[in-house]
Amino acid sequence: MSDVSEDLICVGALAGSFGVRGEVRLKSFCANAEEIEDYSPLLGADGQTRYTLAITRAIKGGFAARIVDVETKEQADALKGVQLYAPRDRLPSLPDDEFYHADLIGLEVYDTGGTLLGRVKAVQNYGADDLLELHGPGLSATVLLPFTKAAVPTVDLSQGRIIADPPAGVF
């Protein structure tokens, strides 16, 4: 697990500079990508560093944005890889069948027979559905489990577990 507070949700990341005038490349992880600006100022992983941003335009793979006090390409480049967080209480409530990735990470995953399959290490998305990245004892390599209603019929946050019915060949 990381040192990031459970009260913070990762909503985006900085991918370096855009141009030579201090703009940054911004990747949004919000369902409606441009809504990331609504949560500004955003916080760094330490929960203290503030990033007040304004989107200037859409670009391939995200947005160009200005951040207060970032005025040069070098300053923007220095922020490459910074993850941006918003306090959970500023984000919208989710329907019962939707989850913030941060809430899934660390949950134990069991099959429908009660056998422990592993623990959620990360949530990935390569363009289609989300994938739960599982690791744990008995797994020789990381396993990617499709995060669909068919493969993951139950997510029980109060019990800290997921019940999975993995497609044939996943395990």
Curated annotation (Swiss-Prot):
Record-linked PANTHER family: RIBOSOME MATURATION FACTOR RIMM
Entry annotated with the keyword rRNA processing: yes
GO CC terms in record: cytoplasm; ribosome
Domain PRC barrel: 96-170
The encoding gene: rimM
Compartmental location: Cytoplasm
Family: Belongs to the RimM family.
GO molecular function: ribosome binding
Alphabetical GO biological process terms: ribosomal small subunit biogenesis; rRNA processing
Name of the protein in question: Ribosome maturation factor RimM
Subunit structure, as described in the record: Binds ribosomal protein uS19.
Gene3D superfamilies for this protein: PRC-barrel domain, RimM
Function: An accessory protein needed during the final step in the assembly of 30S ribosomal subunit, possibly for assembly of the head region. Essential for efficient processing of 16S rRNA. May be needed both before and after RbfA during the maturation of 16S rRNA. It has affinity for free ribosomal 30S subunits but not for 70S ribosomes.
Pfam families: PRC_RimM, RimM
SUPFAM superfamilies: PRC-barrel domain, Translation proteins
